[in-house]
Amino acid sequence: MTPAERILAKALAASPMKSADWSSIQAGLRDRAFFSATVDDARRLAVMREAVAKVASGDLSESQARLEIREALEQTGYTPPQDKKGGLQDLSSQRRLDLIIQTNVAEARGYVRYLEGTSEGALAAFPCQELVRVQGRKAPRNWPEIWKGHGGQIYGGRMIALKTDEIWTAISRFGHPWPPFDFGSGMGVRDVGRREAIRYGVIAADDPPPKMPPEKRPNFNENLADRLPKGREKETDLMLREAFGAQVSIEGDMAKWNGSLIRDMLAGGGTPRARLGRASGALIARIEDEDIRSLAEKNGLTIPRQWMQTHALKHEKPSGKGGANLPLSTGDFELIPSLWRCPDSATRHGDGELELSLETLDGGILTLGVNLSKGTPTTFHKRKTRAPSHSPKG
């Protein structure tokens, strides 16, 4: 897996949750999600994910990525709060965009390097690594104190530990044993060979090569699960259900991220049906018809895998008069949870049916028909409404 592939494999996690809320969620749940604090529009996240992946692969510069994201923000009507303009809470500011781009690119590269550096052969030759500064900072954090405060040892003035040591996860704001270890920290790692590690006394000459337990070598193709934060189980449970609905399943004190559910189902895997849950408050507020509103409040929506695959085949190519119906991409199907939770419009369409619409950033408008009495989708199509100025990848 390349850094760009890791980024594109992450499921869009549109949510109004703030940074502190995300930080309270265990790393196992955050790891499969592409998110940014308070970004609750999946269309914006889709462009951010694509732009960040292109920076990771070298196909875009950071300045070009900022431009693409700003265009998407403008198209979706984003206006920063007047008192937050230019700061980190302004999604269009250079500070916020640099944070999004640089943190995600660094995380993806750190993840790939971690997998390479913890293979059996790599651990035999380079059993340890050193925490080092890779970028200067005007006001650097005191990393030696952070290191020692979490139980790390100093060897000849250097912060060195086995790659399998818990210290790497302990010093990380994100709960990962690979860099970055904090927002804008400027810190990275350097491999330390066996001879050098013996010379500094980190390991003994007769110590066998360390072995990385399988559970510490993350498999990105597996559904990730983690325990809810101890003492905050109920609070976190409610927060996750409100923000993501069926994208997170919770059993007891364990929560599992199902954010890639839609893509997995389109590919023929995953569950036979995706349960998106009951209508959100945002959707209810958009429904004017009282009878339809009552049905939406009562019944949820379940998306069958066969229905999705049928519509994917049906809309592989333009259809209708003058090609009015556009092809549906994987990215379009990924927007179904957003269509259900927070559409641009929701109108009655027949007896017990609701038609939801959402404008896309490539000049189209997605329309999802829902039979509220049965809690199932009826139609799904995309039509062109304007000339696109930016085309996000599906």
Place the predicted regions along the sequence by residue.
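Domain-core detector
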Residues: 1-182, 192-289, 293-301, 313-334, ...
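A short, surface-exposed interaction/processing loop segment used at functional sites
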Residues: 363-394
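Short proline/glycine- and basic residue-enriched helix-capping loop/turn segments at helix->loop/beta transitions
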Residues: 340
